[in-house]
Amino acid sequence: MTYAIIEASGTQLWIEEGRYYDLNHIPVDPGQSIILGKVLLLNKNGEVTLGRPCIEGVTIKATVMRHLRGKKITVFKMKPKKKMRLKKGHRQELTRLMIDSITS
């Protein structure tokens, strides 16, 4: 089982080949391939390689599947004994990536 821990879009992810993951928005058109190079840990058939901080020569090839929006988060502020009520919502822009290959 090959997996890697990478840093992309300001978050660290545990990834495997052939699976898709949702990351913060990446400004790339759907259908295009991108290469993720910040690999922090690589496990290839039980052989673990740990980077300090990143591993040289290991790349992750991924394809952008689509752009989407995350679940709505609602924020409600209120001041007691006043008529102050504030309700706001936020939906995060996300990018769905399909991991094609992990090469070392």
From Swiss-Prot:
GO terms for cellular component: chloroplast; mitochondrial large ribosomal subunit. Its main location: plastid. The keyword Cell membrane does not apply. GO terms for biological process: translation. The keyword Protein biosynthesis does not apply. InterPro entries: bL21-like (IPR028909), bL21-like_sf (IPR036164), Ribosomal_bL21 (IPR001787), Ribosomal_bL21_CS (IPR018258). PROSITE patterns: RIBOSOMAL_L21. GO terms for molecular function: rRNA binding; structural constituent of ribosome. Keywords: Chloroplast, Plastid, Ribonucleoprotein, Ribosomal protein, RNA-binding, rRNA-binding. It is found in: Plastid, Chloroplast. Part of the 50S ribosomal subunit. Belongs to the bacterial ribosomal protein bL21 family. This protein binds to 23S rRNA. This is Large ribosomal subunit protein bL21c. It comes from Pyropia yezoensis.
